[in-house]
Structures are given as C-alpha cells and as structure tokens.
Amino acid sequence: MTKSVMIVEDNELNMKLFRDLIEASGYETIRTRSGLEALDLAREHHPDLILMDIQLPEVSGLEVTKWLKDDEELRHIPVIAVTAFAMKGDEERIRQGGCEAYISKPISVPRFIETIKSYLGDA
C-alpha cells in the first residue's frame, strides 16, 4: 500500500512544489489549504505523515498540531512543520508544540526529501 502525506499549506506555489516533490518520490498526497479541514481529512484518510504550514490564515498550524496530538486516533501521525519562522528559538517552540521535525522555507529540496523519507522510508 502506498504511503501518504497530508499537506496543509495555504500558499498555492508551495503546495504545488511540495505535492510535486512528494509524488515524484512515490508517495500519495492529500492536500488542504485550510487548517480547519486538516483534522477531518486526517480522520478520513489516516495519512502516514503530515506537513504543516505554521502560518495559516484562519488558525495557527501549531494549534492544528495540538488538535491532532490530543486526538487518540491521530496522535501517532508524525507532523513536520514547514515554516518561514527561522529565528533562534522557533524550532524549539515548534517542537514543543508537538511537531516531530521542522523544515524552514525556502526549502532545500534534498533536505526536504530526506526528511520525508526519514519518516516514511522509500516508497
């Protein structure tokens, strides 16, 4: 069974880039621009990994991550924060918010793919 990655990202160009890189690596994607939809989509599809933008329009990606980690059915799914926040202390704050890993924007393509594969293995 093909492993899947849910992408929660409101920027259309970032969404396309992440989708293309992930699908080219052999994984399926589930996509939403809305942090409010993320919980329902995760319950419906049970992705193997979630990529979470931290700066979403209606709700913080850290808040969505908290909802995921508070849900008995979903808390095992690793969440990788993808964010432009790259100041000292941001990674620690993001990890304390429940994210297992952190990728800063603009992304490094090799590091992005390496991080995804470190959680999912080869497709």
UniProtKB/Swiss-Prot annotation:
Disruption phenotype: Lethal. The modification 4-aspartylphosphate is found at residue 53. GO terms for biological process: phosphorelay signal transduction system. It is found in: Cytoplasm. SMART domains: REC. GO terms for molecular function: DNA binding. The keyword Transcription regulation applies. Keywords: Cytoplasm, DNA-binding, Phosphoprotein, Transcription, Transcription regulation, Two-component regulatory system. The keyword Phosphoprotein applies. Gene3D superfamilies: 3.40.50.2300. Essential protein that is involved in the control of cell division, probably through the regulation of ctrA. Its phosphorylation status is regulated by PdhS. This is Polar-differentiation response regulator DivK.
